[in-house]
């Protein structure tokens, strides 16, 4: 009797695995559109791609120091939180510094987005959601897709 139960459970498990794995092989994975990052709409021309790449490269160059500062503050914040006796005043001060750095990055992101719009590059085109930009590569207050994570 036990052997039949084990066989039945194994058969059910294999069946469920086979049925659920079909989604992994179906079409465009999570909207990736065969490697094109643009979310719908018509593909970018070669000129638009070059323009978008330059805008993003400039953005990353201009925000590199800010992003590094934010990462350092994030480590400092986490270290303060894990101290044997956390100092609330220091934690609040570092949190305010992180917020200020985040606002500066937001301002740069807006400038980048305006430059993209002025270049005629539709929203959602180029480097994917959020352009991998922002706080440590993807933190955009409620989303993003990669990066150092949220504080």
From Swiss-Prot:
Inhibition and activation profile: Chaperone activity is enhanced by zinc and inhibited in the presence of EDTA.
Regions crossing the membrane: none
Pfam families: Metal_resist
Induction notes from the record: Expression is induced by indole. Expression is regulated by the ZraSR two-component system.
Subunit structure: Forms oligomers. Stabilization of high-order structures requires zinc.
KO phenotype (gene knockout): Mutation does not affect growth or survival rate, but mutant is significantly more sensitive to polymyxin B.
Keyword Signal part of the UniProt annotation: yes
Name of the featured protein: Signaling pathway modulator ZraP
GO molecular function per UniProt: zinc ion binding
Family: Belongs to the ZraP family.
Any one cellular-component term (Gene Ontology): periplasmic space
Keyword Zinc: yes
Gene behind this protein: zraP
Entry keywords, A to Z: Periplasm, Signal, Stress response, Zinc
Natural source organism: Salmonella typhimurium (strain LT2 / SGSC1412 / ATCC 700720)
Its biological purpose: Part of the Zra signaling pathway, an envelope stress response (ESR) system composed of the periplasmic accessory protein ZraP, the histidine kinase ZraS and the transcriptional regulator ZraR. The ZraPSR system contributes to antibiotic resistance and is important for membrane integrity in the presence of membrane-targeting biocides. ZraP acts as a modulator which has both a regulatory and a chaperone function. The zinc-bound form of ZraP modulates the response of the ZraPSR system by inhibiting the expression of the zra genes, probably by interacting with ZraS.
């Amino acid at each position: 009797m036990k052997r039949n139960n084990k066989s039945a459970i194994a058969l059910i498990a294999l069946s469920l695995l086979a049925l659920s794995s079909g989604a992994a092989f179906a079409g465009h994975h999570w909207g990736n559109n065969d490697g094109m990052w643009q979310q719908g709409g018509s593909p970018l021309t070669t000129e638009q791609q070059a323009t978008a790449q330059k805008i993003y490269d400039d953005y990353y160059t201009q925000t590199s120091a800010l992003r590094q500062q934010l990462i350092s503050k994030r480590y400092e914040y986490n270290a303060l939180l894990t101290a044997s006796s956390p100092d609330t005043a220091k934690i609040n001060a570092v949190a305010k510094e992180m917020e200020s750095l985040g606002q500066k990055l937001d301002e740069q992101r807006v400038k980048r987005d305006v430059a993209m719009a002025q270049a005629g590059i539709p929203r959602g085109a180029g480097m994917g959601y959020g352009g991998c930009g922002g706080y440590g590569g993807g933190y955009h207050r409620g989303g993003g897709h990669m990066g150092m994570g949220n504080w």
